[in-house]
């Protein structure tokens, strides 16, 4: 059996490379061997949050997996089929649900049947896009490419206890190329600010700070305030903002102990303003996540992203090892960048 061999230490050498390698293996049905997994890190090898993505995709593709244990620096993944049906994934504690969705969505839309997943874990946690970003920005922006998927938030989960619940429904999807380089005009900035098991004033202060910062730039703003004392294991708070353009541009900020609510709102608004001022169609989060879909859509795509990240650069390198494509990148890490590729397409 021939494996695609991936050096897990390439680029940042983190968990993102592992997740996308398993995702691409699941879509293409090509066995993959990943070595040097997180060897640059203080705690090298697989961590529990990485194993969650591997095992979730193994269930969906009925894969054979070797080396799937905490601390392992090498892993083999051999997918068998693109299965449909209903699955439950319990990440445990506050592992990011959004990062699991990043890994499994390409396989879900490549399946021959509809897939429904109920995922438990963290919805709003550090170092990962919040679930509201995934629903209101990522999936909204992926719809014109042909991605047929929707998210339903049932309960929020924050670090360190998690306990969030999200449902993902995905249908077989034919992907289309896109040409979106420059940022589109928009009428309003929309958003959702939440606080759970915290005083109501927290959500009000975060929202007011974001609104004030954006209105000083002459923007119309509407932010939904979500406050509850439900069965959430909490506490936690955060805000996600987005333009009503097509594509949407988004930004976010999490609350944390010791960070004033006003700073949370102002930081999110400032991040959004920076994304808008870059003048590109997609924000930097989208730039990280859209790469595989461009390669899987048959035909030429061209997109502009506000800032090329090391994650996006690594994803380009990785995709070129699975698919017969070559990306053209005009720009560089940390700068507005135009990415072009002749997508290979994927026959379902």
From Swiss-Prot:
Biological process (GO) annotations held by this record are:
RNA processing
Binding site residues for ATP: 102, 285-288
Q: Where in the cell is it found?
A: Cytoplasm
GO CC terms, sorted = cytoplasm
Give the first-level EC class, as a single word.
Answer: ligase
Instruction: Give any GO molecular function from the UniProt entry.
Output: RNA-3'-phosphate cyclase activity
Q: What protein name is recorded for this chain?
A: RNA 3'-terminal phosphate cyclase
In the record, what lineage is assigned to the organism producing the protein? Archaea, Thermoproteota, Candidatus Korarchaeia, Candidatus Korarchaeales, Candidatus Korarchaeaceae
């Amino acid at each position: 059996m021939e494996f695609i061999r991936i050096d897990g230490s390439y680029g940042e050498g983190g968990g993102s490379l592992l997740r996308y390698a398993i995702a691409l293996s699941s879509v293409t049905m090509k066995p993959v061997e990943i070595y040097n997994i997180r060897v640059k890190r203080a705690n090298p090898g697989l961590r529990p949050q990485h194993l969650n993505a591997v095992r979730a995709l193994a269930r969906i593709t009925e894969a054979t997996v070797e080396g799937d244990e905490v601390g392992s620096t090498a892993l083999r993944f051999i997918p068998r089929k693109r299965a449909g049906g209903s699955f439950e994934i319990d990440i445990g504690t506050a592992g990011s649900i959004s990062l699991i969705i990043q890994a499994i969505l390409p396989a879900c839309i490549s399946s021959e049947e509809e897939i429904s997943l109920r995922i438990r874990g963290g919805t709003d946690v550090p170092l990962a896009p919040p679930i509201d970003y995934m629903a209101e920005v990522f999936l909204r922006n992926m719809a014109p490419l042909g991605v047929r998927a929707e998210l339903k938030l049932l309960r929020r989960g924050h670090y360190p206890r998690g306990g969030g619940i999200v449902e993902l429904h995905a249908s077989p999807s034919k992907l289309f190329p896109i040409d979106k380089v420059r940022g589109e005009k928009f009428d309003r900035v929309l958003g959702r600010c939440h606080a759970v098991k915290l005083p109501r004033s927290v959500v009000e202060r975060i929202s007011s700070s974001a609104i004030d910062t954006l209105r000083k730039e002459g923007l119309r703003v509407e932010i939904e305030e979500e406050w509850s004392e439900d069965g959430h294991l909490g506490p936690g708070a955060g805000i996600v903002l987005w333009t009503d353009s097509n594509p949407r541009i988004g930004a976010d900020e999490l609350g944390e102990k010791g960070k004033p609510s006003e700073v949370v709102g102002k930081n999110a608004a400032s991040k959004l303003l920076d994304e808008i001022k870059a003048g590109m169609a997609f924000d930097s989060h989208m730039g990280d996540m859209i790469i595989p879909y461009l390669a899987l859509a048959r035909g030429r795509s061209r997109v502009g992203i506000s800032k090329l990240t090391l994650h996006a650069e690594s994803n380009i390198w990785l995709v070129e090892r699975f698919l017969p494509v070559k990306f053209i990148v005009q720009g560089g890490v940390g700068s507005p960048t135009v990415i072009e590729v002749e997508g290979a397409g994927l026959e379902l």
